[in-house]
Amino acid sequence: MARNIVVEEIVRTPVEKQKVELVERKGIGHPDSIADGIAESISRALSREYMKRYGVILHHNTDQVEVVGGRAYPRFGGGEVVKPIYILLSGRAVELVDQELFPVHEVAIKAAKEYLKKNIRHLDVENHVVIDSRIGQGSVDLVSVFNKAKENPIPLANDTSFGVGFAPLTETERLVYETERLLNGEKFKKELPAVGEDIKVMGLRRGDEIDLTIAAAIVDSEVSGPKEYLEVKEKIAEAVEELAKDITSRKVNIYVNTADDPDSGIFYITVTGTSAEAGDDGSVGRGNRVNGLITPNRHMSMEAAAGKNPVSHVGKIYNILAMFIANDIAKTLPVEEVYVRILSQIGKPIDQPLVASIQVIPKQGHSVKEFEKDAYSIADEWLANITKIQKMILEDKISVF
């Protein structure tokens, strides 16, 4: 059965050639990213436990996680958290299987704690955080759709939704993404442990000049005073400056913690390395898209991919799929830019979307007619192998934020 894949040329100025470009990334310690990370870790933990016990991933969506900021008194040399961060786990998951109670809450809380321990180094999970699981039983309608999908080799979409992907990344997009990855990388943390995980990078390109504004939570116990704090800021800027040389020849201006006012004693220091300790709240889906970026110059889906089940929820699967299709087209065909939009219809096989729209800006001297069939084939092959995405998710080969 032929798939509904439409390839067309669009006329627009590629983002790399536009006068103004905005790009954002919220690092893994940002409250919104913490919510995403916990939601996704719970979904993966539930999926693995369902598979272990029943041989199938049962219905769940754990994409409703709220991080409610606590209260802390940071100070150079080491402060304290006086009110813990409250994390609400919500969503739905099958809890009763053949009259046997499945330990949804235990699995979820364990996954959340393990995620925090692994990713937020200075957070004391037992004392700085309260985790409350309110995950409920799945919707009858959605569960029936999910169960019906078990009888088919290709799962049925449990929602009418769309996913969006684009490629290639611009220099600014790469720089913003790689900046956060560098600063939150294992090597950098060993060299400069004072840098917390709550790192937000905002990129602005005006013509051929890029401004990078970096908000980096500094861990108070790792710096003795203002002098050492300012030295840490300088080292951050120096590291990013070196990174930028490998990505772009454009002029890059780097600004770190611009709200600081040393004369007034104002510095961005934290006890735990995340602003969630001090009243900054977080929610799933309010941060990065599945490619790890927030890109107002591009098409984007508002779907929260983190925490959605990896079997039939197209809000997750189609966003990942669209990104993969776009990447492959950009790597192999003569295009300046490619945008992929995939729309499902609830209850229909996920490999048969209502439409897979592929919009391309051909490189100069090329026409879409030259490679229309090739673009179609790339999308068609990915759709034919769509269940690979579930496997990649459970093997932790894909990040969704």
UniProtKB/Swiss-Prot annotation:
Pfam family, one: AdoMet_Synthase
Entry keyword ATP-binding: yes
Binding-site residues for ATP, renumbered to this chain: G136, Q137, G138, S139, V140, D141
Keywords, comma-separated and alphabetical: ATP-binding, Magnesium, Nucleotide-binding, One-carbon metabolism, Transferase
Molecular function GO labels: ATP binding; magnesium ion binding; methionine adenosyltransferase activity
Cofactor: Mg(2+)
One GO term (biological process): one-carbon metabolic process
Catalytic reaction(s) noted: L-methionine + ATP + H2O = S-adenosyl-L-methionine + phosphate + diphosphate
Coiled-coil boundaries: none
Annotated EC: 2.5.1.6
Domain of life: Archaea
InterPro entries: AdoMet_synthase_2_family, AdoMet_synthase_3, S-AdoMet_synthetase_arc
Pathway: Amino-acid biosynthesis; S-adenosyl-L-methionine biosynthesis; S-adenosyl-L-methionine from L-methionine: step 1/1
Family to which this protein belongs: Belongs to the AdoMet synthase 2 family.
Reported function: Catalyzes the formation of S-adenosylmethionine from methionine and ATP.
HAMAP family (UniProt xref): S_AdoMet_synth2
NCBIfam families reported for this sequence: PRK04439.1-3, PRK04439.1-5
Name of this chain's protein: S-adenosylmethionine synthase
Organism, scientific name: Pyrococcus abyssi (strain GE5 / Orsay)
